[in-house]
């Protein structure tokens, strides 16, 4: 352990040995270290972080991972450009309005997770990817199944259904392109032989999972933080222009449903491509390394009063979207939908409150830390 952080041995959720990196400076440094990658030299026998079909183990070719990743980001530059994001804003705003109106029409009380947190980011990703509206309900259900951490068979079945849907969508886009990510990738693929339909489906599924399950967890976290911190909720309600700062603080802070800080496990699996030293310990090639992002985001050496939820916090260099080569490509989309949601929510539902004590809520541990089984609310 050093003043900049620590690297400790632990057992991953899959029951296998791993290293856990803690501390803001060390986490940030190692996230940008090219010796730690998402691929593994022996992908058939790696240590796994969790058991879901998509995210629990390695991804990519160890001999070409960096080159492939740089090419992928270059191909998607147009899809996530400032111009495209601004063109998306009214469409995302419409989806936010439809989701909130749907909860209001359903009446009080409601399950906020089922009415808002789960459908909203999935619908936004469907809009971004170009998934047809008739397919979206099934698409969201398969997405939920695919990230089941405790049921590998269900996870695999959900992933296979998603791939079939993506394949059909790609076929349609070959015939009639639109202003969406899949169409952009098909156009870029005309000049890049490596961009096969399977490669495009793989990239699209990665974008979906990055933008759906994780953003649903942030929305769950955000509503619970706001409804359990009266002064901060009132500040945002009085000044919806605080939504950008509030969203950054929601991204930084832990959910009220998460374990105490000392008991949290890490996320973001990486594999050492060579032997290396970090935090005073020796990490061997092939070892699984995980990052305690939440610990880093509460590091008192970086954040003033880190345990305080402050919707007006000004300096907030959190690592919720990772850092370095693998910084979240869809961060701008996630920020936009979160800002639109939390900028509108309390104006439309000024009396919104939890309908049960916080202690009665249960985290959805088998899917994503901090996500709730349900969030009963009333207004």
Predicted segments with their positions:
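Cytochrome P450
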Residues: 1-379
